[in-house]
């Protein structure tokens, strides 16, 4: 996987799921400046800093703004520090994140998937729009898993058919299939409505 703006759609980082952040770069005078040879490192729960799996992508014509997608392994903690350094140009930028641990409503293995959907197995109760507003996180198989959960994706469920086909927003970076394992997570924005 690579940097993808699709992982910036959630209102907060979910523990052990990919998450994209914007990175501003300012020079010594406080003016926006594009970075030269970015070098981004992270620390989980006050551990030693290590190189991020991805590197900052500078937005064309951005005047000092880039973005980076942290892996699920890089968000697998209570507090995450990200330091975006450069070979020359702007000063280092520091960002802190507090990934949320959300209650698991149900877990399973998908029976199918597509760019913007995941189909629940028949063993999971499904009612029209019941899961709307909940968060789904992939945990293994295609579109999930990897070392430390590096490839896990999290999305908001925007629709649920009576047949158990969940619509998600935004579309998946890597489309799930019948090998994809998942957790459906509750949060204060989800009420199990019908």
Where in this protein do the model-derived segments appear?
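Beta-strand-rich structural segments
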Residues: 2-34, 39-41, 134-137, 193-194
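Low-complexity "stalk/linker" and mucin-like segments enriched in Ser/Thr/Pro/Ala/Gly
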Residues: 43-62, 147-148
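Short, aromatic- and glycine-rich surface loops/edge beta-strands on solvent-exposed regions
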Residues: 76-88
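Edge beta-strands of extracellular beta-sandwich domains
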Residues: 89-102
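Small/polar beta-strand repeat architecture
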Residues: 103-132, 137-193
């Amino acid at each position: 996987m690579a940097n993808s703006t699709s992982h910036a759609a959630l209102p907060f980082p979910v523990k052990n799921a990919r998450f994209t952040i914007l990175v501003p770069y300012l020079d010594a005078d406080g003016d926006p400046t594009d970075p030269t040879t970015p070098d981004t490192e992270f620390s989980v729960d006050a551990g030693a800093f290590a190189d991020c799996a991805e590197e900052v992508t500078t937005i064309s014509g951005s005047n000092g703004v880039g973005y980076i997608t942290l892996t699920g392994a890089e968000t697998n903690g209570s507090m995450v520090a990200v330091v975006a350094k450069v070979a020359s140009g702007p000063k280092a930028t520091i960002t802190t994140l507090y990934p949320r641990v959300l209650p698991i409503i149900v877990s399973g293995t998908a029976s199918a998937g597509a760019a913007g959907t995941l189909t629940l197995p028949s063993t999971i109760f499904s009612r029209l729009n019941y899961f709307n507003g909940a968060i789904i996180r992939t945990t293994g198989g295609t579109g999930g898993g990897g070392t430390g959960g590096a490839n896990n994706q999290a999305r908001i469920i925007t629709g649920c058919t009576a047949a158990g086909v969940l619509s998600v927003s935004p579309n998946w970076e890597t489309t799930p299939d019948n090998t994809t394992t998942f957790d459906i997570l509750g949060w204060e924005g989800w009420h199990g409505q019908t």
